[in-house]
Swiss-Prot record:
Cu cation 4 binds at H467, C530, H535. The gene is LAC16. This is Laccase-16. It catalyses: 4 hydroquinone + O2 = 4 benzosemiquinone + 2 H2O. It comes from Arabidopsis thaliana. It comes from the Eukaryota. Binds 4 Cu cations per monomer. Lignin degradation and detoxification of lignin-derived products. Cu cation 1 binds at H84, H470. Its EC number is 1.10.3.2. SUPFAM superfamilies: Cupredoxins. It holds the Pfam family Cu-oxidase_2. GO terms for biological process: lignin catabolic process.
């Protein structure tokens, strides 16, 4: 029997549609090898640094939503090593998260470990970094997660995409600095320079052989994937003569927001659109400089790069005038506050903001510095930090292993849900007055799928400083923020439960508070800590243990066979 021609065409059209449909495109497995090694750099001065594959910044991981990533990390250096994939949800794969002594024991010298995880429901810019000692000063790089094939951005497709990694640089050996500071109980010296993609720039007191150049074509729109990989510095980022449109933070789309200055804390990522619509006859300064409103030593050196318009050449023309960036003052709290308060989730049909409207676990965490007695330290005290007056003590066995195998004596699950002794948190307190903290490896236990609200209340103990807090294993919604002490009767009435910004790292303002909400839908042990490395070292950290739910799809997977041993 002859098959009608129209029927054949319809069947062929159907199969072509199915084959090209985004839902039928199979995800792939992507393999990477990270050799953690020592090499010599000439930035500022020659010194050995720890890198991945000899690169600073390290290699970029590029994948698509739904892909599975296999990364073999090989340790060729004298230090124990671990690497964290910052912002990856790690659904049921906490063994791959990376923080040393939290989800795994570190990779010892000469050993290796295969990280295996899937990029589920995420697309955008994230990053990876060392998560032990202060190695992330030079051990870090970008993660670029593209949308699934056939799925467009929720904004006009850019002509090209560029990754911008902001970092800090010390002329001295960073590990020696922090070890000496820990010995005497104080803070190490501030960094000597900031860098943009590994270059400090021409006006820095730490000149490199060249500045980073950002070539653009007139009339084209570019997407910049900006990452703050600095250890201890919140930063302003600006490009002279150009407006930036924020479209994503921490790998979550936002409502477009136009600004001339980006404020970005350590651990955060921000995607912006840049249209090259300025006078092509000039070069334009790209600048990254410190923001701080605390009275502490900081790196006041501005990193610079050059945006230049290209035609038939891709090099910077030294004969062109360079338009300088008009940077905010380094204590411009109003600039940082305006930027932070202007961010909103996209909250579209395709990308809804699923904000918890009810709360089962309401937590109140005071975050700040303290001082404990120390006979061998300067002034007889050691600077520390804590949450609810608890300075977190790192275990000698990974917490996730202790949880999974029911190993006793490693941690307790009695982390306080609120301070034991309430006080006027934002009133200045003199050194030695209620400044001491208790030590402990305390976790807070959550049942699977619990809705959680945390109010992070900054304190003025010792001094009031900003604290960018990162939560592993989850995204959360920033539903509110304010100055002064949080008022549980008044402040929740102003919470944004419609389109609050969603992210994995949030700033707690000096002298104020931030409220976040999330759903505990990821079983395992999940670290929460200040992303100022100094404060983390001093103990400004804790962890959640999330129990398994019902059935295998709500349960932590077993550990891999090559999980490092302590």
């Amino acid at each position: 029997m002859e098959i009608p021609r129209r029927f054949c065409i319809c069947v062929l059209t159907f199969f072509v549609f199915v084959l090209l449909s985004p839902t039928t495109v199979h995800s792939i497995i992507r393999h990477y090898k990270f050799n953690v090694m020592t090499n010599t750099t000439k930035l500022c001065s020659s010194k050995p640094i720890v890198t991945v594959n000899g690169q600073f910044p390290g290699p970029t991981i590029v994948a698509r939503e739904g892909d599975t990533i296999l990364i073999k990390v090989v340790n060729h250096v004298k230090y124990n090593v671990s690497i964290h994939w910052h912002g990856i949800r790690q659904l049921r794969t906490g063994w791959a998260d990376g923080p040393a002594y939290i989800t795994q024991c570190p990779i010892q010298p000469g050993q290796n470990y295969l990280h295996n995880f899937t990029l589920t429901g995420q697309r955008g810019t994230l990053w990876w970094h060392a998560h032990i000692l202060w190695l992330r000063a030079t051990v870090h790089g970008a993660i670029v997660i593209l949308p699934k094939l056939g799925v467009p951005y929720p904004f006009p497709k850019p002509y090209k995409e560029k990754t911008i990694v902001l970092s800090e640089w010390w002329k001295s050996d960073v590990e020696e600095l922090i070890n000496e500071a820990s010995r005497i109980g104080t803070a190490p010296s501030a960094s000597d320079a900031h860098t943009i993609n590994g270059h400090s720039g021409s006006i820095s007191n730490c000149p490199s052989q060249s500045s980073y150049g950002l070539p653009v074509r007139a009339g084209k729109t570019y997407m910049l994937r900006i990452i703050n990989a600095a250890l201890n510095e919140e930063l302003f980022f600006k490009i002279a003569g150009h407006v930036l449109t924020v479209v994503e933070v921490d790998a979550v789309y936002t409502k477009p927001y136009k600004t001339d200055t980006v404020f970005i804390a350590p651990g955060q990522t921000t995607n912006v659109l840049l249209t090259a619509n300025a006078n092509a006859g000039s070069n334009y300064m790209v600048a990254a400089t410190t923001f701080t409103d605390a009275h502490i030593p900081y790196d006041n050196v501005t990193a610079t790069a050059t945006l230049h318009y290209i035609g038939h050449t891709s090099t910077v023309s030294t004969s062109k005038k360079t338009v300088l960036a008009s940077l905010p003052p380094q204590n411009a709290t109003w600039v940082a506050t305006k930027f932070t308060r202007s961010l909103r989730s996209l909250n579209s049909l395709e990308y809804p903001a699923r904000v918890p409207t009810t709360v089962e676990h309401s937590l109140f965490f005071t975050v700040g510095l303290g001082a404990n007695p120390c006979q061998s330290c300067n002034n007889g005290v050691r600077l520390v930090a804590g949450i609810n007056n608890v300075t977190f003590t790192m275990p000698k066995t990974a917490l996730l292993q202790a949880h999974f195998f029911n190993i006793s004596g490693v941690f307790t699950d009695d982390f306080p849900a609120k301070p034991s002794n309430p006080y006027d948190y934002t009133a200045p307190v003199k050194l030695g007055v209620n400044a001491a903290t208790m030590k402990g490896t305390k976790l807070y236990r959550l049942p699977y799928n619990a809705t959680v609200q945390i109010v992070l209340q900054n304190t003025a103990m010792i001094l009031s400083d900003n604290h960018p807090f990162h939560l592993h294993g989850f995204n959360f919604f920033e539903v509110g923020r304010g100055l002064g002490n949080f008022n549980p009767e008044k402040d929740p009435k102003a919470f944004n439960l419609v389109d609050p910004v969603e992210r994995n790292t949030v700033g707690v303002p000096a002298g104020g508070w931030t409220a976040i909400r999330f759903i505990a839908d990821n079983p395992g042990v999940w670290f929460m800590h200040c992303h100022l490395e100094l404060h983390t070292t001093w103990g400004l950290k804790m962890a959640f243990v999330v129990d398994n739910g019902h059935g295998p799809d709500q349960s932590l997977l077993p550990p891999p066979a090559d999980l490092p041993k302590c």
